[in-house]
Amino acid sequence: MALLPDKEKLLRNFLRCANWEEKYLYIIELGQRLPELRAEDGSPQNSIQGCQSQVWIVMRQNAQGIIELQGDSDAAIVKGLIAVVFILYDQMTPQDIVNFDVRPWFEKMALTQHLTPSRSQGLEAMIRAIRAKAAALS
């Protein structure tokens, strides 16, 4: 996650964008910074249902109990949204993820108001899947 900003910097950078075209480009840029997903991680068990695009999210717990997330999508904007979600959940334990509500951050960014309904539903599906996987680990 070293290539991605922390939560506060994400919000600052997002709010500095002059318009929604710049914000979308920033989201896409964040997606390009995600490390490449290993071929074996692009399996059906890591696929997120409820997304219009293909989405894979892998969750691993490190020795310190911190969750490490990896993901990919076949759509650039969706891959960027994955990066945004990963930034919000960065350095958290499974219980932290279960307890943390990302929606206020999306509201601060005015993110959901500018996504198509299918993208918003896909974003919710990603969050539900991450929280469910975290709950199983906590």
Swiss-Prot record:
GO CC, one annotated term: cytoplasm
Classify the main location. cytoplasm
Locate the active site: 51 (cysteine persulfide intermediate)
Q: Could you state one GO biological process linked to this protein?
A: sulfur compound metabolic process
Any Pfam family the entry gives: SufE
Which segment of the chain is annotated as a signal peptide? none
Q: Which InterPro entries match?
A: Cysteine_desulfuration_SufE, Fe-S_metab-assoc_dom
Keyword Repressor carried by entry:
no
Under PANTHER family, the record lists: CYSTEINE DESULFURATION PROTEIN SUFE, SULFUR ACCEPTOR PROTEIN CSDE
Q: What's this protein's name?
A: Cysteine desulfuration protein SufE
In its UniProt entry, the species of origin is given as Shigella flexneri
Gene (UniProt): sufE
